[in-house]
Amino acid sequence: MWKYCIHIVFVLVSCHVDAQVTRVVVDASGQGDYRTIQEAINSLPDDAPAPRVIFIRKGVYREKVFIEKNNLLLEGEDKDQTVLSFAIARDTWRCDHPDDWGVATLNLRGSDITLKNLSIVNSYGFDNTAGQVEIVCSADSVNHRKTIIRQGHQMALRSFQTTRLKVINCILKAYGGDTVSPWNVSAGMFYFKDCIMEGGVDFYCPRGWAYAEHCSFIADDGPACIWHDGSADSDSRTVLKDCSFSGYDGFKLGRYHRDAQFYLIHCSFAANMADQDIYLVPTTNIIRWGRRVYYYDCHRKGTDYSWYADNLVSARGAPDAAGINPHWVFRDKWDPEKEAQP
């Protein structure tokens, strides 16, 4: 009997230990478990049944970060004072590398990742204000040189096979294009809440299924703020709810090159936004499902433009705006708001 009781106690203690959340602390001054974010990531196993927490204390971490592991929460102490920053132009990177792995400040391949209370910055365009530079480029087979412009692609976040990504109360910024690039057109599910995003052309450009709520978008340059690729599945969509848009005089809202599906609900636009609807860029791509751009209760400071008048009734299934939420986007595949926090 005693042996049986001891065995039960041992099992319960083991379960409790297994259920405990792994937590490591990053502190650039050396007062934590690790000085760099990458060291903390590298210290953990590739996977785990529950999220591992990497708590990052205030500071500026000038490093490029790679995450190929699953089930991680990177949480900053303060979004304004916990800064991950690196300077890299995509065109420079691709001169010596065959793909985009490493092109961003934060590079993701793992899934079930949460980013919280962080600033993630690609500072290339902010640092290089001269306009353009010429570099040696082995990928250029003719001249072996390339001109890098300040407005070119500069990714703060770039994902690959990643799905079930949550970004909460973060600042993501670059001066150039494709600042926030969560790309997984066939299976990617991405959730953004209470974030600030800033950049150039297509600086928020998800592929797959994306939901952004109460986010602010700031355009520094370029012919569009938002972009979407939903070409792999007619159900994929990008939803922007209670979001605000501002930027340089005459900034344009959005565009697409492939099949896309936009829903803008209760969004607000600065007075200096251009009178230009989300538009299709002419290419050789075949658009199979037609134009799918929908608005509800969106307003510009001053006089409204007619093109964002309510048209949800024309969307498939004529959805009710009140029912457009994460569950409506991700269906039964994922509910980012109901999952237990570590």
Q: Which residues does each PLM region occupy?
A:
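Bacterial Sec-dependent N-terminal signal peptides
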Residues: 1-21
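Sequence-level preference for short, compositionally simple segments enriched
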Residues: 21-342
